[in-house]
């Protein structure tokens, strides 16, 4: 069935090239895992003491860590794929400032997607109880902490644990803001400007 002239998918770029299937899969998988981790992080942070058993809290936190490491691995694959597979160009009618804004938002997203799990890994490695609480990726494979941090004295580790935790939290809020701008920009182009940019990233 042909699209009508009123369809938000009709425009000068209606036939725009799509991202590759691998890029689309990585994009939505990373997005889903990040949203899941946001929910798990909020559960761990906002639930009052005693709301969950120690075992349940440990499960939530360990799952949060496992997803974070998975996101880091997928982000590396995403960057490697992008470097070897040129993404489709933005529509020619986009003004320069929008092109620059889109590029800046993508760079910020990549930086934060790496910074979040890395800061979390550093935070976890500086935990004073890390040596007696091995980390297992989804309960299956033991994941190493960062050795030189674990070998520091307890006072230094406690200080670093707090600092890396604050950095992890700051990165999370920055990621929320950039994601909100990214989504708002995509919806603006789709529904107001009538450019079919969303279709490029749809499965």
Cite the ranges covered by each PLM segment.
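Membrane-embedded alpha-helical bundles that constitute the cytochrome b-like, heme-associated redox core
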Residues: 1-203
């Amino acid at each position: 069935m042909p699209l009508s002239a009123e369809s938000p998918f009709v425009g000068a770029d209606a036939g725009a090239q799509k991202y590759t299937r691998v890029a689309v899969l990585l994009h939505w998988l990373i997005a889903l895992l990040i949203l899941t981790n946001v929910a798990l992080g909020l559960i761990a942070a906002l639930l009052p003491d005693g709301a969950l058993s120690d075992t349940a809290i440990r499960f939530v936190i360990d799952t949060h860590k496992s997803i974070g490491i998975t996101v880091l691995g997928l982000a590396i694959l995403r960057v490697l794929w992008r470097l070897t597979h040129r993404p489709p160009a933005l529509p020619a009618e986009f003004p320069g400032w929008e092109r620059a804004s889109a590029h800046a938002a993508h760079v910020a997203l990549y930086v934060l997607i790496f910074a979040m799990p890395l800061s979390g890994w550093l935070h976890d490695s500086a935990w004073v109880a890390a040596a007696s609480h091995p980390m297992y990726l989804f309960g299956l494979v033991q994941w190493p902490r960062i050795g030189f941090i674990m070998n520091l004295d307890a006072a230094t580790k406690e200080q670093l644990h707090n600092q890396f935790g604050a950095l992890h939290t700051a990165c999370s809020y920055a990621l929320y803001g950039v994601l909100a701008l990214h989504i708002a920009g995509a919806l603006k182009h789709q529904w107001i400007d009538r450019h079919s940019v969303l279709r490029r990233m749809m499965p």
